[in-house]
């Protein structure tokens, strides 16, 4: 039997945590090399970002949720996990990303190089440094149900599932909407973000980034990318358009429509290449997965207490792919020496 092809899913803002994926650092060669490449590309800031990621500093948890740390590290970890999969000799049939995860998908599909991605991440961090305090709110309701309840600059920031919507906007306005929703018995919880991602609030702050994207040699994807910006496959024209990427932080994430299209086009094994297993939880609700035509395999644990769980989860995922009929190569091992990691996660 021909095995179901794999598709890689990359999570975005809200999934981050200190030491995400760190159990593969110093253990998997491709993952380690990619993370080190990112830290090198970050220049003088790289060592500090690395230490914050590994929990070697006294960085408060809430500061890790800020764009300055969360976005570059989510991008780095996603690219590192994707390259670790490619290093096993496994070619994905499709890529899909949520928020910053779409930049990861574009990088692995060859739309842009890792070095350009890191530079653009630095540009995004700088552009959003002076943005007003923002918030995001996960709500157990459809976007249509929520539309009449939105106030001021609060908008739908993401459609994650038919009844799983993310709202975004200025922090005080989001809080008022949260109080109204809770008073009406609608389940909601704050997402881990200090910026109003995927709302027009950020438009003035990212307006100038089209110039930075324009300096990058953007290319058509060499692998199929299902764009959560479009809710559809990424076209060559969109991939090469600097304005498409510059505007991404201000536009809603249509993750469920994009996932729905992917799973309508083909039956796959969805590998979540990032922390938290949030996209895995969403994807398991899709009829194609619930009915067994497609499957979901996370590469990292949901809430690790020890860094060794990262390697255990990655190894279990590889074994699952073998059971599916794939023939992954032996994982590249880092020569003994290098990295001393703290044992426990927060």
Identify the residue ranges that each predicted region occupies.
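Short hydrophobic/aromatic-enriched beta-strand-loop microsegments
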Residues: 290-300
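Helix N-cap motif at beta-to-alpha junctions
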Residues: 143, 169-174
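Flexible, low-complexity inter-domain linkers and amphipathic docking helices that mediate domain-domain
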Residues: 47-48, 179, 216, 325-346
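Short amphipathic alpha-helices in soluble, non-transmembrane regions
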Residues: 149-152, 174-185
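A generic structural motif
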Residues: 163-169
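Acyltransferase
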Residues: 138, 186-272, 281, 307-315, ...
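FabD-like malonyl-/acyl-CoA
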Residues: 1-149, 187-196, 269-282, 298-303, ...
